[in-house]
C-alpha cells in the first residue's frame, strides 16, 4: 500500500486491508509486550521525542509462537522491565472500564502468575522464565480487548520526552503503577477491583483500602528487588 501515509496509520483503526497474500506470524523474544496477540504497536521518533502508538486489528498476528527458549538468556534488566510491563497490562485490563467476563480470567491469571514467577525469573530460574512468557501472553489477550489506563498513557508520553534520554517502556510503567493505583483507588469501583487483585494474590488487609495499600507495597517491593527506580528523578531525568 504505497499510497498510505504514516499520518494515516497513526489514526486508530485506519490501516488498509492487509495479508491478502501472506499470513503474519509473530514470535516474541521478551516476556512483556505481548505484541504477538495484540492490535497495537509503537514507533518512537527520538528526534522529536514522540512515541506514536499504532492501533488496528489489521496488525494483529494470525499466528503466535510463544517459545520460552527464546527468553532463557534475556538480561535481568529486560526481565525486570518487561515483567513489570506484563503486570501493568494485566492490572490495567482488570481495572479497565471495558473489563468483561472474557477479559477478567485472562487478566487475573496473568497477575497471579507474575506474582508467583517474576522474582524467580529475575533470578535466572528457567521454569519461572517459561511461566512469565506465558503470563505476558495472557495479559496481552486481556488488554487487547479491555484496553489500558493512564499508566500506559503516561509511559508513552514521557518515554521519549526528556533530553536526558529514553525511559524504557517497562521501567516507566513500573515507576508509575504504584502512584496510579493510589490515585485510581479513590474511585470506589477501581478500589474494589484493586482489592480483589490483592486478595487473589494472597495479600493481607482487613478493608479494601488496606488491601489496596498492600498491593501497592508489594509492587514497590518488586521494583526494589529488581533495582527499578522509584521516580523519574532516580532514573536520571532532571527536567
Model region roles, listed by residue range:
Residues 1-69:
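Glycine/threonine-rich beta-strand-loop-alpha-helix active-site module
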Residues 32-33, 138-173:
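Glycine-rich phosphate/pyrophosphate-binding beta-alpha loops
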Residues 94-99, 146-148, 182-192:
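Short helix-capping/linker segments at secondary-structure and domain boundaries
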Amino acid at each position: 500500500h504505497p499510497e498510505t501515509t504514516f499520518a494515516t496509520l497513526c489514526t486508530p483503526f485506519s490501516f488498509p486491508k492487509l495479508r491478502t497474500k501472506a499470513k503474519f506470524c509473530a514470535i516474541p523474544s521478551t516476556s512483556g509486550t505481548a505484541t504477538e496477540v495484540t492490535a497495537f504497536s509503537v514507533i518512537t521518533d527520538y528526534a522529536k521525542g514522540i512515541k506514536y502508538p499504532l492501533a488496528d486489528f489489521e496488525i494483529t498476528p494470525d499466528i503466535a509462537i510463544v517459545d520460552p527458549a527464546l527468553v532463557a538468556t534475556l538480561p535481568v534488566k529486560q526481565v525486570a522491565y518487561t515483567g513489570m510491563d506484563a503486570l501493568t497490562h494485566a492490572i490495567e485490563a482488570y481495572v479497565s472500564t471495558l473489563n468483561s467476563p472474557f477479559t477478567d480470567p485472562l487478566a487475573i491469571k496473568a497477575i497471579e502468575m507474575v506474582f508467583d514467577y517474576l522474582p524467580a525469573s529475575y533470578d535466572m530460574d528457567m521454569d519461572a522464565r517459561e511461566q512469565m512468557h506465558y503470563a505476558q501472553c495472557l495479559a496481552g489477550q486481556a488488554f487487547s480487548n479491555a484496553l489500558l489506563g493512564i499508566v500506559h498513557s503516561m509511559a508513552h508520553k514521557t518515554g521519549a520526552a526528556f533530553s536526558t534520554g529514553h525511559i524504557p517502556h517497562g521501567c516507566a510503567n513500573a515507576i508509575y503503577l504504584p502512584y496510579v493505583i493510589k490515585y485510581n483507588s479513590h474511585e470506589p469501583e477501581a478500589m474494589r477491583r484493586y482489592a480483589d487483585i490483592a486478595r487473589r494474590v494472597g495479600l493481607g488487609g482487613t478493608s479494601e483500602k488496606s488491601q489496596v495499600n498492600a498491593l501497592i507495597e508489594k509492587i514497590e517491593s518488586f521494583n526494589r528487588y529488581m533495582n527499578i527506580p522509584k521516580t523519574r528523578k532516580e532514573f536520571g531525568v532532571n527536567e
